[in-house]
Design a protein with these regions (language model features):
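Membrane-interfacial hairpin junctions
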Residues: 3, 115-117, 123-127
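Transmembrane alpha-helix/interfacial motif
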Residues: 3-42
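Predominantly long cytosolic amphipathic alpha-helical stalk/bundle segments
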Residues: 31, 35-121, 147-180
């Protein structure tokens, strides 16, 4: 495995970094979203009594008598906090194959340089550049595909959280407005 990494050339390092950062973000967000969604399943009474961290600013605004628009702005701010980091996953899923493609180009340049500087070309002389081209392309795609899937999954979960938060916010506002 290390031999393949080395044959991929210097661009394997940024591809590996993309993989590490992407997987770390996915794991972090998955745990965060799981906890938030677990709290979001609480009833309105439980939310008021337990006050999940994500709902705290909304509950505080409701108790202060903020209007529906103000509560909506606070809710949007909370959703943005939840979504923080998702754009990095999108970026990683986009640039990993581009880095791989750059490795394809540099590998093919190396192969053509061998052809240019040799009077007779032996296929094994071209192998290094071709190895680099193929390995970096594959590595870029192997990083991008699961990161893209993780990004899509987490975006859906963030949308679910935002929906539940809006629903609870509306219910809290209506309850407070009606004096319940």
């Amino acid at each position: 495995m290390i031999d393949i990494f080395i044959k991929g050339g210097f661009l394997m390092y940024p591809i590996a970094l993309c993989s590490i950062v992407g997987i770390s973000l996915i794991i972090n967000k998955f745990i965060q979203y799981h906890q938030i969604l677990k709290e979001a399943q609480l009833s309105l009474e439980e939310i008021i009594n337990k006050t999940p961290k994500i709902m705290q600013p909304i509950i505080d605004a409701t108790k202060k008598g903020c209007n529906e628009k103000e509560i909506s702005v606070i809710g949007t701010r909370q959703v943005r906090k939840i979504e923080k980091g998702l754009s990095w996953l999108s970026l990683i899923a986009t640039i990993a194959p581009l880095i791989g493609l750059t490795g394809t180009v540099t590998g093919m340049i190396k192969a053509f340089m061998v052809i240019e500087h040799s009077t007779t070309v032996n296929p094994s002389m071209l192998a290094g550049g071709i190895w680099e081209a193929l390995i970096t392309t594959a590595a870029g795609l192997l990083v991008a595909i699961p990161i893209h899937i993780g990004h899509h999954y987490l975006e859906k979960r963030a949308d679910d959280i935002a929906f539940v938060m809006r629903e609870h916010s509306t219910n809290l506002y209506m309850r407070h407005r009606n004096g319940i």
